[in-house]
Every structure is written in C-alpha cells, then in structure tokens.
Amino acid sequence: MPTFNQLVKYGREKRKKKSKAPALQGCPQKRGVCVRVYTVTPKKPNSALRKVARVRLSNGIEVTAYIPGEGHNLQEHSIVLVRGGRVKDLPGVRYKIIRGALDAAGVEGRRQSRSKYGTKRPKEEKGG
C-alpha cells in the first residue's frame, strides 16, 4: 500500500489495454494476399465446414481470416481487405475478410444485412 506522498509524487500506473487484433497494428483494415483458402471444422457443440483463408498482410504478418457469407470467389493470390473480429467457434481465427472490397465479391442473392456482405441493392420487380 503506497503512502499518500508516494501517490502524489508517482501516481498510479495505468493498465495497458491489449489489442484483440494485433496484426492490424492499430489500423481499422489492412490489405493482404491469400496464401491458402481452405475449410476448418468448428469447436465441440457445432458442426460445419467453415471457410477460412490464410492471408499475408501488407505489413508482412500472416493471419487466418474468416470468409463470411454463403459462397465465395476467393483463391490463392486473391487480394483482400481484412478487418478485426473473431469467430467464436474457430480457435485462432481473429480476423474477417471484408466482402465486396478488392477481389472478394459480395454475396449473391443476399436481401437482408446486405451492407455487411457487400451486396448491391436488388432491382425492383414490377408488382401486379
């Protein structure tokens, strides 16, 4: 327990906040090149084949990023934009690829939450 005089002289040390997406180095997004595109199985209660990509970022760091949405056009050497955000049931996946930016096309046929999947507004059909 510090004395009052010690607190006046030195103050308390602020706790450092640890980044949840360190590879982005404080940037909101980073550009990268897909090194490998593959599927992984999620943790225990869930079952699926989740689409992920190993991405080498423009700062040289290599990360595993999740590809959201149904279907994608990504392959090796595709250039993508990566943002922070983990996938709870995939251990070690702490980044997501932004759909509709650079080489990652938007999700086809998406009608709701389109902005999150890079989908353009659908054409209005003539209603009878």
Swiss-Prot record:
One GO term (biological process) = translation
Using the UniProt annotation, give all residue ranges assigned to the region (Disordered): 1-24, 105-128
* Organism domain of life: Bacteria
3-methylthioaspartic acid PTM positions: D89
Q: Which UniProt keywords apply?
A: Methylation, Ribonucleoprotein, Ribosomal protein, RNA-binding, rRNA-binding, tRNA-binding
| CDD domains for this protein | Ribosomal_S12
Q: Does the keyword Ribonucleoprotein apply?
A: yes
Kindly list the GO CC terms recorded for this protein: ribosome; small ribosomal subunit
Q: Does the keyword Ribonucleoprotein apply?
A: yes
Its Gene Ontology molecular function terms?
A: rRNA binding; structural constituent of ribosome; tRNA binding
Mind telling me which InterPro entries this protein's record contains? NA-bd_OB-fold, Ribosomal_uS12, Ribosomal_uS12_bac
How it assembles, according to the record, is:
Part of the 30S ribosomal subunit. Contacts proteins S8 and S17. May interact with IF1 in the 30S initiation complex.
User: Family per UniProt?
Assistant: Belongs to the universal ribosomal protein uS12 family.
- Role according to the record: With S4 and S5 plays an important role in translational accuracy.
State the NCBIfam families in the record. rpsL_bact
> What is this protein called in UniProt?
Small ribosomal subunit protein uS12
Please tell me the species this chain comes from. Answer: Aquifex aeolicus (strain VF5)
Gene of this entry? rpsL1
